[in-house]
């Protein structure tokens, strides 16, 4: 009898071409790597449903995915079964059997991302794949002031990668926290959903505010323009982490 199993996954996206598997099977992705592990453990071909399509180089602290299986492996034991076949940069933190109708993507009601910045004159070779280096001191208060303009429901067309054919570019950001501890700055962004590159462009724009290249109130003008060219840079993928997903 078919069952539905949910996974909670942590991964280092450095050596992967994002989450989503590609037609070219030689391209390494997180999804294809976990599917291979499931097939090794169950001897079944499965389709792994992901909660979000993270880009190449983006990391995840608590990614949710699910798959249907006829395997008799108990739900809570799948994490052990799969971790045996996974590389060291992917780990299943939790596994459990869930109702058949559960869908990792469609049932997700909110997400939190965190963008990490190393704010000091010298970069860190050890952290180079996990944090974005900004050598000049950031004005955190200005960044916090700018972030307030992003809270709420807006058309975020200016904060997405150009192109695409979406029904709507309206999204709701529920909270942005900008924290600094020693030389580490973190931008935590929570919302009901995000457009392609949205969190990276928001982070890049807030960094430009922190470097006094823009004023905090410029954010309002950028939103109203709905023009990608008006917003700031798309911050590098290596600093971005999918931190948390929310379900009813």
UniProtKB/Swiss-Prot annotation:
E.C. code: 5.4.99.12
Chain residues that bind substrate: 113
Transmembrane regions: none
GO function term, MF aspect, one: tRNA pseudouridine(38-40) synthase activity
Any GO BP annotation: tRNA pseudouridine synthesis
Active-site residue numbers: 55 (nucleophile)
Reaction catalysis annotation: uridine(38/39/40) in tRNA = pseudouridine(38/39/40) in tRNA
Keywords assigned: Isomerase, tRNA processing
CDD domains given in the database record: PseudoU_synth_EcTruA
Family: Belongs to the tRNA pseudouridine synthase TruA family.
NCBIfam families xref list: hisT_truA (TIGR00071)
Subunit structure: Homodimer.
Role summary: Formation of pseudouridine at positions 38, 39 and 40 in the anticodon stem and loop of transfer RNAs.
Listed name of the protein: tRNA pseudouridine synthase A 2
Organism for this UniProt entry: Clostridium tetani (strain Massachusetts / E88)
Lineage: Bacteria, Bacillati, Bacillota, Clostridia, Eubacteriales
